[in-house]
Structure formats: C-alpha cells, structure tokens
Swiss-Prot record:
Residue ranges, compositional bias (Basic and acidic residues): 114-130
GO cellular component: a single term: mismatch repair complex
GO molecular-function term, one example from the UniProt record: ATP-dependent DNA damage sensor activity
Spans annotated as Disordered: 114-137, 369-391
Function: This protein is involved in the repair of mismatches in DNA. It is required for dam-dependent methyl-directed DNA mismatch repair. May act as a 'molecular matchmaker', a protein that promotes the formation of a stable complex between two or more DNA-binding proteins in an ATP-dependent manner without itself being part of a final effector complex.
PROSITE patterns, A to Z: DNA_MISMATCH_REPAIR_1
Protein name as it appears in the record: DNA mismatch repair protein MutL
Gene3D superfamilies recorded: 3.30.230.10, Histidine kinase-like ATPase, C-terminal domain, MutL, C-terminal domain, dimerisation subdomain, MutL, C-terminal domain, regulatory subdomain
Keywords, ordered alphabetically: DNA damage, DNA repair
NCBIfam families: mutl, PRK00095.1-2
Gene Ontology terms: biological process: mismatch repair
C-alpha cells in the first residue's frame, strides 16, 4: 500500500470545487453572493455559452484592497468571519472562503477590483490554480470577476454538463432567485451579448411581479406575520392558481434561497384542503430569524439548512398560510397582516408532524397536533395596509352607451328583493317541511327573517351580501346570483360540499364526533370481505364519524345510523366508501391522520346533487353559508365554487362602448 502523503493545494482545490461548483450556475451563485456581501447596489451578469465559455459579474461594491487581492483566491481566506462565534452568528451570504479558490482551480479566472480610495484598480489572473502577479488596471469602484472555459482542465467533469441552453436556464434561474431575495439591488443579465433583463432597485412587491409574473401577483395573497424573533412574509397564490410544476415555489431564510423540508411540509399541510389532485401551490416566502437560530453551514452550497427550533418555524408557516387560505371566502380575501391572531384564532386546526431527517420528498402523508406559539408582532413587508390589491380589469374601455346608474341598480334590486320576500313565504315553508322530512338543505337553518324590509331606503355597499341574491337555477347545476355590480355563477354541488365539509370538521373538533341520526328502518347491503373486516376493526371509529353499522352475517351489513347533517344521502354508497377508506388506511394512527379525507368523502355524499331543483330560499341559504364558511372559494378537491362576471366584463361581451 502506498505511503500517506499530503495532497497538493491545487488538487485539494479541485476536490473542493467538485462540491462547490457542480455546474456554471453554482459558480455564478458564489460570485454574485460575494458582490452582495460587498454592499453592491448594482450587479451586471454576462454569460456566454450558457456560462461554460464565460461568466462575467461586475458590481459597484466596496471592492478588494490591493494587498488582499491575491489572498482572495486562496482557500479558506475570507473577511467575513474570524472566530467560531462569528460562524455561529453569520449574517453574510458567503463565509467559507472556498468559492473563488474553487472556481479559480477549474477555470481561467480574472479578478479586477478597485476601492474608493484607490487611484487605480488591481488585477490578478489564475489559470489551472496558478496565480499571476497583481497588475494595475482601469476599472470603476467595485469588482469584476471573469471565469472563462469552466472545467477546461477537468474534461471528465465537463462531460457531465448538459447543453448550453440547459446550463443557461440553470444560471438564469439562480440569478432570479438572488434578485428576488435582494430587491434593493439592481440586476441585469446578458446572454451571448444580448440583453435578457434589467431590473432596477425595486420594492419587494414589484420584484415579485417582475420575477414570478404578474399573473402570480394578481392571484396571490400577501402575508406578514411574526412569532417572537421570527418573521414570515411574502405572497402565496390562491388555490385556483396551483400548477402541476414546482417552478414557482421560493423559500428564503434570512434572504438565502433554501430547500427546506420543514417549511415545504408546512406549506403543503396548509394547502391540503384546497388543492386538486397533484397540483402544487405557488408561493414566495421570506423567513427572517436571528442568525444563531439557523445553521447554514450544513452543505457547501448552503441551500440546506438546519433550524434550532424547527417546530416553531413549522407552526408559524402552517398557521399563517392556513389563516390566509381560510379567509378566501365570498370575495372577502385579504392579506394576513393581523399576525397577532394567526396562532390563536384558528380553532381546532392542527398541522401534520414535521418530516424527519430521513423522510422522502413526498411530504403529504402525516398529521398531528402542535401547541400554539406566543402572540407574534405585526409588521408588513410590503409597506401597505395589508389589503390585497383587486385584480385589474383588462378588457374593453368603459362603455359609452347608457346604462343603469348605481342608485338605479340598487333600486331595481330592492324591488326584486321585496317581491321575493313577499311571494316566497310559501316556498320557504315548503322548504322547511322538506328539510324536516329529508334533511337535504344545504344550510342547517333557513334564511333568517328580518324586521326591516330590504326596500326601506337605498342600501349601502356594506348592507348587500358579498354573493348577492339568487335569481335562478341554471341546468340543475348552477345558481345564478346578482351582486352589487356583477353576476355570479355558483356550482351548487361544489359549494354545498365545502359547506358540509367545514361543518363536519367543526363538529368533530368541538364534540369529538359527528351527531348521528338513527334510521327508522335499517338499510342492508351486500359487503365484501374487506368491508366486513373494516367494520369489525373500526366500529368505534365509524361511530365517531356518525355511522352505525352492524354485521348481519353472510357478508351482509346493516346501516342503522348516519350523520345527521348528511340528510337523505345514499346511505349504502356512503357506508361502502367510508369502509373502503378505512380498509385502505390501516392503522388507527393513520386513520386519524386521514380524518379530513374521510370527512371530505362523506360531505360529497351529503351535498346537493346536480339536477335537483332548489327553491330561492334554499339557494340564498347556500349563498349565506358560503359567505360564512372558510375556504369556500374552492370545493374539497380544489376546484372553484363560483365565478364572477363584472358589469364591465358583461359590457365587453356585447361590445358596449367600443
């Protein structure tokens, strides 16, 4: 066996480069982070050949002292930390002193820098790990680093690179993340000499729109919440904006882009009730916390981190997002800037347990209780009142033809409302009788009567319900409603499904079980062996869901009681679906974790079906329930429950004013 020998510095640098510089995007990240740490307010990036042929980064930062310029290309040489205590409280983007040395060992690197009090710049070159002597050069205050012919001396590594287009895409994505994390810095990018983008110093709100897109901005909810020394802010997309890709998911911890399973798990748990199928949410989240509360020295790329109190982080992220999403109802969506209520006003809502270190990338499959945290402080990251800006209208110009004034529209609505109130007493009484007989009303209570007629005076905007009044039922599927200045279409099954689901969740949380209603005559049905086994194993669990079944022998089961609020649902289909869910889930712990999924299945059975004719009182009762139900903008599967056509959009359809 050969004798042990110390490796030469050049080989050590190339080994380190294998960890730090996997591709051009990693080299770009290291260089740009140095510019950020230097206090630059403008950073210009040029890429040739996807960053393989050339990466050039210029900044207007503080520059490097002429006596230190050679030292900057040595391993473990840095100005950012000096003691172990500095490492535990690191606030800079870089601190390891490996980035430039690693890049210099696998490229032809040129470093030119000038400080404000210097008469000229100083330049040094490195090739194959060998440094040239510093020379004077012309350069404004700041630093320019050029890394040419990446991996020219390690052909095996270069073979693993993808096409120039692919490598460029990784570089552009990396630069966008850095620009998003530092909106106060101006960024520009050129590709093969052609400008790609130029971002001025902006507010966070403007930078999110520039990087993530205006479509995300108009479909997002602003959040700004805190808990002790932790602060969470940014924007999350409404569930209807969810996509099948994860390209619009950004997590930043102390302005550093990270891939953290704790934060990602909390986000997924917050969205679990409102996402459809395999769709994923879009979000831009910033978490600020003391540097000593997070360890960024886990991996050389610094995208993996470790929180000192991961449970507190999980709580803050989950409860903040859950609160924001719960408020998306009846066109009353606002940003969550009332942070003091976030961790205390969510009754009975608990996230799933955090993933362990060995968890896989699929983080959907767990749920458990967490204690609530302390009442947090309130700050708004966007410098506004916290209100979400209304979605801008992009259709036709304002109509020029005569239309009803707002006062005339209200008067017309009042006339309708008064007629509706006087002529529908019989319908209301019939619907009450129907509810008593079948229990199939979307709401548990009829519309409350008021002593003040709706036509007494012109109502103000605040007196009109957000979803307006029902006008008619379309095709046995949709409810047509008129609001203050718009026409609404409501999917009655999807809406009733969400209302029933939230009611059942609330009843389970308050009482520990669903109230059941015994059937006068039990309903029997033929069951499979798996369904019979599920009944034998989980009879007590079924009782908690308001279902009472008994085994009659011969693979025959009898349904003796069903949840009271599900009315005249198909009890056999309901029982078979719930038994099927229990048979698939397995252990009692997993059943508890999948409770909401079982409730969602049950609510679907108890909701009004397409084709059923509703009376006006029933339709209006459903609208009022929607206005008071969390997450009522989406059904349990993430589909929208209603859409709005404004007066301007209706005018545009008929070319009014064009």
């Amino acid at each position: 066996m050969p004798r042990i020998a110390a490796l030469p510095d050049h080989l050590v640098n190339q080994i380190a480069a294998g960890e730090v510089v996997e591709r051009p995007a990693n080299a770009l990240k290291e260089i740009v982070e140095n510019s950020i740490d230097a206090g630059a307010t403008a950073i210009d990036v040029e890429l040739d050949g996807g960053g393989i042929r050339l990466i050039r980064v210029s900044d207007n930062g503080s520059g490097i002292h002429p006596d230190d310029i050679e030292l900057a290309l040595h391993r473990h040489a840095t100005s950012k930390i000096k003691t172990l205590n500095d490492l535990e409280h690191v606030a800079s983007m870089g601190f390891r002193g490996e980035g430039l040395a690693s890049i210099a060992s696998v490229s032809r690197l040129t470093l030119t820098s000038r400080q404000e009090d210097s008469s000229h710049a100083t330049q040094v070159k490195a090739e194959d790990g060998k440094l040239s002597s510093p020379t004077a050069a012309a350069h404004p205050v700041g630093t320019t680093i050029e890394a040419a012919e990446l991996f020219f001396n390690t052909p095996a590594r270069r073979k693993f690179l993808k096409s120039e287009n692919t490598e460029y895409a990784h570089c552009a994505t990396m630069l966008e993340r850095l620009a998003l994390a530092h909106p106060h810095i101006a960024f520009s990018l050129k590709r093969d000499g052609k400008p790609v983008f130029k971002l001025p110093a902006q507010s966070l709100h403007e930078r999110i729109a520039a990087i993530v897109g205006d479509d995300f901005q108009t479909a997002s909810l602003e959040i700004d919440s805190g808990n002790g020394a932790l602060r969470l802010y940014g924007a999350i997309a409404k569930p209807t904006f969810a996509k099948g890709k994860t390209d619009k998911q950004y997590c930043f911890v102390n302005h550093r882009f990270v891939r953290d399973k704790v934060m990602l798990h909390a986000v997924k748990q917050a969205y679990r009730d409102v996402l459809h199928n395999a769709l994923t949410p879009a979000f831009v989240l910033f978490l600020d916390l003391p540097p000593e509360a997070v360890d960024v020295n886990v991996h050389p790329t610094k995208t993996e981190i470790r929180f000192r109190d991961s449970r507190q982080v999980h709580q803050l992220v989950f409860h903040t997002l859950n609160k924001a999403l719960a408020d998306t109802r009846a066109d009353l969506t606002e940003s969550v800037s009332n942070a003091g209520e976030v961790l205390h006003d969510i009754t009975g809502v608990t996230p799933a347990p955090m993933p362990s270190e060995n968890d896989s990338e699929n983080l959907f499959d767990s749920a458990s209780d967490y204690p609530t945290g302390n009442k947090p402080d309130t700050r708004n990251a966007f410098g506004s009142s916290g209100k979400t800006a209304p979605m801008p209208y992009q259709a036709a110009r304002a109509p020029q033809q005569h239309s009803l004034s707002l006062r005339e529209s209200r008067a017309a609505m009042n006339t309708y409302a008064e007629l509706y109130k006087k002529t529908d007493d019989i319908d209301l009484e019939l619907s009450r009788l129907e509810q008593a007989r079948f229990g199939n009303m979307p709401s548990e209570t009829p519309i409350p009567k008021t002593d003040t007629p709706l036509s007494d005076g012109i109502p103000s905007q605040s007196e009109l319900p957000p979803l307006g009044f029902a006008i008619a039922q379309l095709l046995g599927i949709y409810i047509l409603a008129q609001a203050e200045d718009s026409l609404l279409l409501i999917d009655m099954h999807a809406a009733a499904e969400r209302v029933n689901y939230e009611k059942m969740k609330r009843q389970r949380q308050e009482n520990g079980k669903l109230q059941s209603q015994r059937l006068l005559i039990p309903v029997t049905f033929a069951a499979s062996h798996e369904e019979c086994a599920a009944l034998a194993d989980y009879a007590e669990t079924l009782a908690g869901f308001g279902l009472e079944l008994s085994d009659m022998g011969g693979n025959t089961l009898a349904v003796r009681a069903v949840p009271a609020m599900l009315g005249k649902a198909d009890v056999v289909s309901l029982a078979k679906d719930v038994l099927g869910e229990l048979a698939q889930v397995g252990s009692s712990q997993t059943i508890e974790e999948h409770e909401n999924h079982i409730l969602a299945t049950m609510s679907c059975h108890g909701s009004v079906r397409a084709g059923r004719q509703l009376t006006l009182p029933e339709m209006n009762a459903l609208l009022r329930d929607m206005e008071n139900t969390p997450r009522s903008n989406q059904c349990n599967h993430g589909r929208p429950t209603w859409v709005k056509l404004t007066l301007k959009e209706l005018d545009a359809l008929f070319l009014r004013g064009q």
